[in-house]
Amino acid sequence: MQDERVVLEAGPDGLPVLFERPRELVTASTPAGAQLALARLEQARAAGFWIAGYAAYELGFALEPALADLWQPGAPLLHFGVFDAPRPVDASAEEGSALVTGVTPLWSRARYAESFHAVKEMIAAGDLYQVNLTMPVEVSFEGSPEALWSALRAYQPVGHGGFARLGEEVILSRSPELFFRLGADRRIEVAPMKGTAPRGATPAEDDALRDALGQDEKNRAENVMIVDLMRNDLSRLARPGSVKVPELLKVERYATVHQMISRVVAELDAAPTLPGLLQALFPCGSITGAPKIAAMRAIHTLERWRRGVYCGSLGWAAPDGRAEFNVAIRTLNVTAPGRALMGVGGGIVHDSTCDAEYEEALWKARFVTGLMTA
């Protein structure tokens, strides 16, 4: 297991760390296997080891009994390593050269419109309030996965990126979004990201686009819906009265887009287990919609593709109870030499328009398409 490793940019002290030479790999491809795997990971953590790896979006079907019928056989639901303590790593180190040679949405605009209008009908019928509709995108590249991750990292610095090579899969994540951060004192923070606008060509245009996003009623409503969902998810574990929203509707700049973010914090009622945390919170509401179970059913019906690690989570957990996981957006799964699959999309609400949502989805691929000319 010499090649297996996980690099996470948001390590235990907020700095990049490397997990290498795992003592054990823990994976599962069925709901029953996932429950056993999570129990094994918790056992390893209790024995003084660290765990690091990733969970696929579809793990949510194994964790929520109301969604159990959606599971279909396929790729792993989770893949983690059991490690000794991580070591600091220079995440900016060069890994060779890489070039993106193609970025191809696997849905046509008409295919997207078909699912978009179906979501709008569900919203009009009162079945749900928001659905995070995504579509698959194929990426072709030259160079190693490590070199591609290095190039992506240089092009779009983010706070929650990661690289994982565990078994057969290689995952490259350039996520800017925190799923949850848990301290040894049982304080937990989530930071849902909802609302996107492109960067401007000039400083003045860029400021105008940022300000417009911050004032946009649709995006503000979309973000608040997910904040409410996350507050509800946290309340399943939190001490009564401890769930707070210290930051609401903040707009942050990234290399290719502006993003609207909020922050929710809570104090957990008891020392949580990793299975308990994921049972309450996974997957993150920002990539499902609301209500969560209804939105996930709609996604399963309308998308008809396996998201995999995209919209799942990469992260680590420590023996002392600390843990941090991202929301695996802007994330690629290397499927063959020189080929990878990712997803792009966004939240659909009652006043969304098809053309605007389709274009927003394409903006979110700029962290990759930018390397075609870099």
Predicted segments — roles?
Residues 1-374:
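Extended alpha-helical targeting/anchoring segments
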